[in-house]
């Protein structure tokens, strides 16, 4: 598995190891869906100004957000890897052979503010956003009520298995 982390200059999420929590949560999200592949995911930690710019550019929404997910694959159903072809050169890194799932961008400003707002730890908020985004990279969504319920259940199970509670 390749999990790369880039933290923008001057950005910090105090009191946690971003790399460790990212790796643990991402691995558990992949276990949750029984992903049969070694995967590659990149994470960028940034601030509200930068994520707002990216959100406007890619989603047409001129507003800061907590997390953006950029999946590289389309799934028939959430977590269903049966449509992934090992023969598709665009799905796998030619150097490592890892399945390229996508990119995650998280606002450190939002992590800190939401942890305080929801009354839980920064670690819990960060792990939640990683779980949420990893599920998006595996085809989950929350546009419809039934999809949202399925995704929320998955997020909670991942965090529970990691022992991360409110």
Q: Predicted regions span which residues?
A:
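An acidic/histidine-cluster motif and surrounding catalytic segment
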Residues: 1-127, 137-166
């Amino acid at each position: 598995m390749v999990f790369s982390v880039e933290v923008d200059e001057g950005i910090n999420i105090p009191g946690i190891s971003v790399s460790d929590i990212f790796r643990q949560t991402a691995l558990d999200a992949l276990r949750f869906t029984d992903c049969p592949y070694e995967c590659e995911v990149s994470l960028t930690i940034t601030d509200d100004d930068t994520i707002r710019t990216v959100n406007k550019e890619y989603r047409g929404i001129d507003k800061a957000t907590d997390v953006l997910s950029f999946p590289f694959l389309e799934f028939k159903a959430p977590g269903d890897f049966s449509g992934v072809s090992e023969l598709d050169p665009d799905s796998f890194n030619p150097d490592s052979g890892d399945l390229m799932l996508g990119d995650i961008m998280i606002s450190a400003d939002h992590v800190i503010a939401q942890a305080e707002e929801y009354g839980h730890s920064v670690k819990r908020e960060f792990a939640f956003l990683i779980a949420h985004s990893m599920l998006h990279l595996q085809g989950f969504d929350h546009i419809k009520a039934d999809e949202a319920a399925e995704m929320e259940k998955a997020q909670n199970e991942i965090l529970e298995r990691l022992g991360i509670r409110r």
